[in-house]
Amino acid sequence: MAYFDNAATTYPKPECVYQTMDEFYRNTGGSAGRGNHSFSMATSNLVAETRKKIQELLHCPAKQVVFEPTATIALNIIIQGVVENGARNIYISPFEHNAVTRTLSGIAKKASLNIIELTVDSSLHYDLEQIRYQFESVPPDFVIVSHASNVMGLIAPVKDIFILAKKYKAVTLVDMAQTAGLVDCNLGLEVFDFAAFAGHKTMLGPTGISGFVMKPDIDLPPILFGGTGTESANQDMPLSLPERYEMGTLNTVGISGLYASINWILAHGVDTLFREEHEKRSMLLSLLQEYDFIKIVGNRAGDDFVGIVSCLIQGISSESAGEIFSSNNIAVRTGLQCAPAAHRFLKTFPAGTIRFSVNAFTSNADFDVLREALEFISDNL
């Protein structure tokens, strides 16, 4: 399989991820915080060490790491909690995933929300002066920004946006599903209140383990409830972190894989991995641009992109193109990629695009297979 679907989930994983998960399940496999026996204690230590690794990776030793099964659940916990605390003027980027927009839409059926899109100009630059004016006109309570679009890879200047937002004491949330472990971001800065991450994407870990980073002095009302292994006589969720938001048994085998992947990333270097991915993105763009029947969507010069490219093929729907690529043993993602707002901005709604996404593991052999498929399409248009 020539794999160009890394924005959905990265593949392959570093070999150490497979080995660590196998070893964990065969030799430990305990439940964290659920006993004093050696298996449980060893697993609890692993969970604690993985939190420290995430703090190291994201430069936030003073902030709390909370594990969840998915980034979508993490975003729900944060967004629903912040709104319950009173946020009403909510700014989002034009490129948010349904994990954000559907959550806000669901809340808006029960609460009066003023949802405003941050200004991005036609050349795909966040207009900071216009955003400053937006905030002056309607002061923000809550600002949510996808660090990189999962449709075309544009990286947002989140620090600059959040500096503006903090003048109004807004709560800030960055969705790092497409960037954690790939784009260096100092979450230790005061402007970052919350950040969601997806372990199975740019963090190169397994599916089923994600979470968020938060300032420890912010209290969100929990939206999910259950056992935590602590304060079991108390029928309210504990006030202590991270237990307040970690209900049920943690995916400890997933955490073991994430621990291994983060160690691998730290050893190789975040900047090195980004540079390698950017080189692969340039190779992908060069290949696609050889064919005049392909239209690249949402691209411009600059290095503020992760390894995602969206395109259209003249005369072929994105769905049909996906079937052609699949029949040629190529993995891509077609349609709206769970981000209809981005496609409305790019004027590719409702059909969507063909999305290719590369990373450091994308090989020359993958590009050779893709070229053969593009030649097939060229010969049969």
Residue spans for each PLM region:
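Pyridoxal 5′-phosphate
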Residues: 1-381
